[in-house]
Amino acid sequence: MKTIIIKMLATTALLFSASTVFAADAPGRTECIAPAKPGGGFDLTCKLVQVSLLDTKEISKPMRVTFMPGGVGAVAYNAIVAQRPAEAGTIVAFSGGSLLNLSQGKFGRYNVNDVRWLASVGTDYGMIAVRADSPYNTLNDLMNAFKDNPTSIVFGAGASIGSQDWMKTALLAKEVGIDPHKMRYVAFEGGGEPVTALLGNHIQAVSGDLSEMMPYLNGDKIRVLAVYADKRLEGDLANIPTAKEQGYHLIWPIIRGFYMGPKVSDEAYQWWVDTFNKLQQTDAFKKQRDIRGLFEFNMTGKELDSYVKKQVEQYREQAKAFGLAK
């Protein structure tokens, strides 16, 4: 009997150890890669977690933020998968735009299955903005001018043709009967550059994400004509009308989060999952999320992995409608 009990205990211990992943200790060095130049949504996403992790003492040393522009995320994605696949302390920011690019095969030979999807930190919404002194006071003003003379309006965004910023603008063009491929669209690298171009009067409108406009909303330089949410947002943003209420069938939420290299150990990955699960419930994190104009959207680990892969498939179908994917 004693022998049987010992064998049962040994078997139970073996099964437990085989099916359970324990989190590793906190990485000694942490880094967040923002796949664009400073000033855009990726920068915002990295800074959010950089501040929150330190404020909550989940890490003892400041997280390094590194900018890796190129291909609207493709350079960073390829670097992590091919050159830095096992770095336990490195996370990379992604957004809905990253997933859209993946759906169109814009990240080269790598696809949605080639990284470890880690955590979301919130959702943003698409928007369109003009200079505060622009003659276009409403979305209808802008789109009517565009419809009358498509070449008179230059749209700018921090991403290339086929990106989510282009798709949002293309959907507006389609609603007023203009071929999206004929609109004047200037692609910049990152969300900060098109704002600079707008303020310099080099373009007439910026298609981007609402969070990217947050630093400018308290001043008198930028006017957001519409936010692509289902209903008006709350608080200080309640004065911004939705595209929907102005007669346009455009709703575009934008997830923001992080992924890791494909060869990061299960233990290291689990530390990050557990840390984000705790972090998302703290007042410090919620404060930083609110400051950056993001709305609650908490997912980690397997749940996020499933969401991301479904979203990529949905984006692929939308891209096909514009002839951007096979």
Language-model-detected regions and their locations in the chain:
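Hinge/capping helix and adjacent helix->loop/strand transition within the periplasmic-binding protein
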Residues: A26-P27, D55-I59, A79-T90, L102-E193, ...
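N-terminal signal peptide c-region/cleavage motif recognized by signal peptidases
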Residues: S17-A23
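N-terminal (or domain-start) structured segment
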Residues: A23-D114, I161, I178-A205, E296-M299, ...
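Ligand-binding pocket segment of bilobal, Venus flytrap-like solute-binding proteins
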Residues: P69, S152, A157-S160, Q164-N239
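An extracytoplasmic/periplasmic, membrane-proximal ligand-sensing/linker region
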Residues: D266-K326
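C-terminal lobe and pocket-closing loops
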Residues: E212-Q281, K310-E313
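Bacterial N-terminal signal peptides that target proteins for export
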Residues: M1-L9
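Short coil/turn segments
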Residues: K37-G39, G96, R131-Y136, G158-S163, ...
